[in-house]
Regions:
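N-terminal presequence-like segments and the immediate start of the first folded domain
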Residues: 1-33, 71, 94-106
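Short, solvent-exposed loop/turn elements at beta->coil junctions and helix N-caps
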Residues: 6-9, 82-87
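Short, well-ordered alpha-helical segments
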Residues: 21, 26, 34-81
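Membrane-proximal amphipathic alpha-helices
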Residues: 88, 92-93
Length: 106
């Protein structure tokens, strides 16, 4: 599955547009990791626990979007974008959306 943020794929032509596909995940913070994050906020630096959590969330949301696209017969997804939103205190949603298409070599 080709997944790109651009509106086209070099060397490919879009032969069919299938529509919007999406994948999301909602993650809650972990109290133990929050304690480590508080210390990082005091001394500065990257909060690796949150970086890892966001990376895992992004991969899961992308995998779910790909499954959505495969179910409708797509072999590529274009115009992919991500967004996050706060669901509740301590929980956030990561949403990935794109346009499912069928592409062929030019």
């Amino acid at each position: 599955m080709l997944v790109v943020s651009s509106h086209d794929i070099p060397g490919k032509k879009i032969v069919k547009t299938l529509g919007l596909v999406k994948g999301n995940t909602i993650r809650a913070r972990h109290i133990g990791k929050d304690i480590l994050a508080v210390f990082k906020n005091i001394v500065g630096g990257e909060i690796q626990e949150y970086t890892k959590l966001m990376a895992e969330s992004r991969e899961q949301a992308i995998d779910r979007m790909i499954q959505d696209a495969e179910q409708i017969g797509a072999n590529a997804i274009i115009s992919v974008s991500t967004t996050t939103s706060v669901i509740s205190q301590g929980a956030a949603e990561l949403l990935v959306i794109g346009t499912a298409v069928v592409v062929e070599d030019e």
